């Protein structure tokens, strides 16, 4: 029987052939090509992962085979996993990153991308200036890369920094072929604003390590973007606004108290309640949206809640690690008793929970409450959220 842990793991069953070779797919949620290189060396199974669009190649990963031609690939540092079944011509299963789940199939040949018309994408020639820029996060000693657009032949220009949401994002916040930050930058610069958008640290042309970073680190990156705009001769340093999407909205709130002369902040689908509260709502809504219900859903929700409560009540991530082990064992036994999982899966599930939860970014996010900063914001504030948004409902 199959169970979906919306924060943890999926298990699939099937039959198949040899898994060795190069396997290609494209993640629909991010329009992101992905390649697995699976081989056997000195009697050991080895896998490396390419994300060509992100210019990331030969990333190390862990591979596990089990009965029924099941396969699992894990990249623990960035919370990514694939679990499924290998066949003679494909690998089919579930890709997971954080709470995001996607059914995908890998094939032996690269998948030709479908050409989709995007009439909303900006088209040259542009009516504004455009520069590829780099600016320094002095506190963390790293260079961030971005694009700076601004009206031609003007000075004292009001400016906007665009801050992306959670997960590694390029400067356009590109997903499924959509480039919302590019479109926003084009629209705003045509209206007379200077706009800076940048690649997340450790992503595309920005330096740093994304996998080990927390929201606090991303706040420092966004603050560095503001300081860079303040140094530009075209910009009116007293008229700078931070526009953040999702986690970027949370970051904007913090900057609203950290940078005293900030003109304003804009939160697009940002959060206003503590991380564990968001996740309790988010994971249930996501589960219901894909048809999960009944005892499986309730037990999964109870498991998640116990983990998040332990994070809140712990003094540090090391103390939480001790609690996590006992909580996981307790609930895995309950899943086994209800026959939602097989006994042979217990150890792997516990390990997957550990990899998902003992993550500095996740630990900080669960504990952080925007109520710490929101009452202290003194600049202008605009908050926008979609009525059908189940991620930050």
What name fits each language-model region?
Residues 377, 383-385:
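Short beta-strand/loop motif that positions the catalytic acidic residue
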Residues 18-86, 90, 94-97, 181:
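Central antiparallel beta-sheet cores of small beta-barrel/beta-sandwich binding domains
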Residues 174-195:
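Short amphipathic alpha-helix adjacent to the substrate-entry channel of hydrolases
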Residues 156-166:
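Short beta-strand element of the alpha/beta-hydrolase
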Residues 234-246:
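Alpha/beta-hydrolase fold nucleophile elbow
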Residues 268-375:
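Accessory cap/linker subdomain of secreted extracellular hydrolases
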Residues 112-155:
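N-terminal cap/lid segment of alpha/beta-hydrolase-fold proteins
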Residues 212-233:
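Alpha/beta-hydrolase active-site loop
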């Amino acid at each position: 029987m199959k169970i979906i842990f919306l924060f943890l793991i999926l298990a699939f069953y099937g039959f198949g052939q040899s898994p060795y070779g190069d396997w290609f797919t494209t993640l629909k949620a991010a329009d992101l090509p992905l390649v697995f290189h699976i081989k056997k060396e000195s009697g050991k199974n080895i896998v490396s992962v390419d994300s060509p669009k992100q210019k990331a190649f030969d990333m190390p990963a862990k591979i596990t085979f089990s009965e029924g031609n099941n396969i699992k690939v894990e990249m623990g540092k960035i919370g990514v996993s694939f679990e499924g079944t290998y066949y003679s011509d494909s690998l089919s299963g579930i890709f997971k990153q954080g709470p995001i789940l996607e059914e995908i199939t890998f094939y032996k040949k690269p998948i030709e991308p479908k050409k989709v018309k995007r009439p909303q994408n900006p088209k040259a020639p542009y009516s504004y200036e455009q520069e590829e820029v780099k600016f320094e996060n002095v506190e963390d000693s790293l260079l961030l890369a971005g694009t700076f657009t601004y009206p031609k032949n003007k000075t004292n220009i009001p400016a906007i920094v665009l801050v992306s949401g959670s997960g590694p994002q390029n400067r356009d916040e590109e997903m499924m072929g959509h480039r919302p930050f590019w479109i926003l930058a084009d629209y705003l610069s045509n209206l007379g604003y200077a706009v800076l958008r940048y690649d997340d640290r450790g992503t595309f042309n920005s330096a740093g390590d994304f996998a080990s970073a927390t929201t606090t680190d991303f706040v420092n990156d966004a603050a560095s973007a503001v300081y860079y705009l303040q140094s530009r001769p075209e910009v009116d340093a007293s008229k700078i606004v931070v526009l953040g999407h999702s986690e970027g909205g949370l970051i904007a709130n913090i900057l609203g108290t950290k940078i005293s002369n900030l003109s304003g902040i804009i939160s697009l689908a940002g959060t206003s309640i503590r991380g564990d509260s968001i996740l309790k709502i988010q994971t249930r809504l996501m589960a219901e949206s894909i048809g999960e219900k009944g005892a499986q859903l309730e037990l999964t929700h109870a498991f998640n809640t116990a983990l998040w409560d332990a994070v809140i009540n712990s003094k540090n991530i090391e103390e939480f690690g001790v609690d996590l082990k006992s909580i996981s064992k307790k609930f895995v036994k309950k899943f086994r008793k209800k026959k939602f999982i097989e006994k042979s899966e217990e150890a792997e599930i516990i390990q997957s929970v550990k990899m998902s939860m003992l993550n500095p970014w996740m630990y900080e996010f669960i504990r952080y409450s925007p109520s710490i900063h929101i009452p202290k914001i003194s600049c202008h504030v605009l908050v926008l959220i979609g009525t059908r948004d189940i991620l930050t409902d």
